[in-house]
């Protein structure tokens, strides 16, 4: 640290590293911790009777500038992307690097089905720019989905208890072991500064009628060093009096509520789209599933369920909603999950344009890639 930066640190108590203190020397949250936003220090200097007096005011950054908006898609290897969006002839190992030329973040979907090995995660890091962000879905068993033993890491399969249908029972010991293995893989992203949030996408069967949010506290505690976003897939968590209890729970635990854009229907699996909740002012999350109610309810595959191409008018609505969230959050992640054909990457590109962000031009001769 040079003399100028050292003097700045001593004067303000603020550094650009991973550990911060406020003006009184108290520890502030580390980068990436699920906590309240770090305040910036506004230093006002004025002259009085030939003497300089310094007034140091802790000013919430939200009052002076909006948060950063990152736009991406839920996966980079969806079959529709390969067929319609990527350049023809591009190799599987080249797709992520090409994706990263167009977007600053991606939501990893494959981790829902299996824990990636260290070599795979290391390749993700090497194939993306330094500032790229990975939001990562937690394993489906941690998300309270019905899970066959074969989808567990090999070292856990033979020890897992199963029911009569061969589905794994989520015991405290298994939850801890699976979480530790998952976090070891994520430590590579974390060490590279590329880990965004861990996404807990709860099963629709996890309902307030049968379950209590306190059941998640053990997992939340194990993930305390990461930013955790929770997507409810049962709308009963987000309506009536239950909504306030849900939001209060997330705020107490500094977990991030996942806001949704979905069809205007009241089926229990469709979350309401009129919520813009920010439960951790470090980050707001918005996932877009499309607005095709019939496809959403009847689709037998992901491509069929999320078969929706956002119109320009709807993209403009999403842009305004993203800006509203950015007014009260340090960062906003907007993820298109309408993964049919190339709908998601095209919608994400159009949203970046609507937000005034840089849009990479598609290659003129994709056959050459």
Enumerate the predicted regions with their spans.
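Intrinsically disordered, low-complexity regions enriched in polar/acidic and amide residues
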Residues: 35-36, 62
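Residues lining hydrophobic/aromatic ligand-binding pockets adjacent to catalytic sites
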Residues: 54-369
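Short, low-complexity, charge-dense intrinsically disordered segments
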Residues: 3-7, 12-22, 28-31, 37-50
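Intrinsic-disorder/low-complexity regions
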Residues: 1-3, 18-21, 59, 336-339
């Amino acid at each position: 640290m040079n003399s100028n930066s050292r003097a700045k640190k001593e004067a303000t108590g603020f550094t650009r590293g991973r550990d911060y203190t406020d003006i009184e020397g108290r520890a502030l949250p580390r980068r990436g911790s699920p906590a309240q936003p770090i305040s910036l220090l506004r230093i006002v200097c004025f002259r009085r009777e030939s003497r300089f007096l310094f007034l140091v005011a802790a000013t919430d950054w939200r009052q002076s500038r909006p948060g950063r908006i990152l736009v991406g898609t839920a996966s980079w290897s969806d079959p529709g992307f390969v067929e319609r969006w990527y350049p023809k002839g591009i190799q599987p190992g080249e797709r992520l690097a090409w994706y990263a030329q167009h977007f600053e973040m991606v939501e990893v979907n494959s981790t829902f089905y299996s824990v990636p090995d260290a070599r795979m995660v290391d390749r993700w890091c090497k194939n993306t720019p330094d500032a790229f962000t990975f939001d990562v879905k937690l394993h489906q068993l941690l998300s309270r989905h019905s899970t066959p033993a074969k989808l567990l890491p090999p070292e856990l399969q033979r020890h897992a208890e199963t029911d009569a249908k061969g589905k794994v029972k989520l015991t405290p010991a298994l939850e801890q072991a699976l979480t530790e293995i998952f976090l070891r893989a994520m430590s590579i992203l974390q060490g590279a500064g590329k880990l965004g949030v861990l996404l807990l996408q709860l099963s629709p069967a996890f309902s307030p009628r049968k379950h209590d949010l306190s059941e998640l506290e053990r997992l939340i505690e194990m993930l305390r060093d990461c930013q955790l976003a929770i997507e409810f897939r049962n709308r009963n968590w987000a309506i009536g009096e239950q909504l306030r209890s849900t939001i209060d729970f997330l705020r107490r635990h500094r977990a991030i509520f996942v806001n949704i854009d979905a069809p205007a229907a009241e089926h229990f699996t469709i979350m309401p789209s009129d919520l813009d909740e920010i439960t951790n002012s470090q980050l707001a999350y918005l996932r877009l599933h499309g607005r095709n109610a019939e496809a959403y309810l009847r689709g037998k595959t992901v491509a069929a369920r999320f078969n929706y191409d956002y119109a320009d008018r709807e993209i403009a609505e999403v842009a305004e909603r993203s800006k509203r969230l950015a007014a009260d959050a340090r960062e906003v992640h907007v993820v298109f999950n309408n993964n049919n054909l190339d709908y998601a990457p095209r919608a994400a590109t159009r949203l970046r344009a609507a937000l005034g962000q840089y849009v990479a031009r598609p290659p003129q001769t994709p056959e050459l890639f």
